[in-house]
């Protein structure tokens, strides 16, 4: 088993994926495939700084650190940023627990973040509403070599979706959410 995946509730102590977290596990692994594809863009001879904006519970943040540092041997400094203080505290606790000295989490708004002067890679995975826009702007401002972004646009679309023909379906919240 991968210890951080156990603590984050994705895997059990026997190393099996929790059924309800299978989609999350697949999502993490797919994103790591993207990272594998861009490895030639990252300088393995120097520290690589990566920001994960809107990191949430940090499934991906921990996976990136583990993959890049433990499996691929990169000297990475990874920063996760999110609005939720309780989640950030938990993530920092796990980073300490595993001795991940160059993995840090901060509470804050992406639009106001000024914690670094340059980055090598900016990551956003389902950062909600305008968070992705701010993250992309920051990445460009810093001249990031790599930007990996999978926006979370369903919330924005959900508010705007209107269609008379589909109204019988859209009146049900769960179906409207799935449609968006």
Pin down the residues of each PLM region.
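Structural motif corresponding to the C-terminal cap of alpha-helices
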Residues: 12, 35-43, 68-72, 95, ...
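Conserved SAM-binding motif I beta-strand of class I
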Residues: 75-82
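Phosphate/oxyanion-binding active-site loops and adjacent basic polyanion-contact surfaces
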Residues: 23-30, 56-60, 83-87
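Class I S-adenosyl-L-methionine
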Residues: 14, 83-180
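Conserved Class I S-adenosyl-L-methionine-dependent methyltransferase catalytic core
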Residues: 1-48
């Amino acid at each position: 088993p991968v210890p951080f995946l156990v603590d984050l509730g994705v895997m059990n102590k026997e190393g099996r994926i929790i059924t309800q977290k299978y989609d999350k596990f697949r999502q993490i692994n797919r994103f790591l495939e993207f990272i594998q594809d861009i490895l030639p863009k990252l300088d393995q001879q120097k520290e690589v700084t990566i920001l994960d904006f809107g990191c949430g519970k940090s499934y991906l943040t921990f996976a990136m650190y583990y993959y890049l540092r433990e499996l691929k041997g990169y000297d990475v400094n990874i920063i996760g940023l999110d609005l939720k203080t309780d989640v950030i505290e938990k993530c920092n606790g796990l980073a300490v627990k595993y001795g991940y000295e160059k993995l840090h989490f901060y509470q804050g708004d992406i639009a106001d973040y000024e914690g670094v002067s340059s980055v090598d890679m900016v990551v956003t995975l389902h950062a909600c509403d305008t968070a992705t826009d701010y993250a992309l702007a920051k990445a460009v401002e810093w001249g990031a070599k790599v930007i990996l972004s999978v926006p979370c646009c369903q919330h924005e679309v959900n508010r705007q979706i209107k269609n008379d023909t589909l109204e019988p379906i859209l009146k049900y919240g769960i179906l409207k959410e799935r449609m968006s």
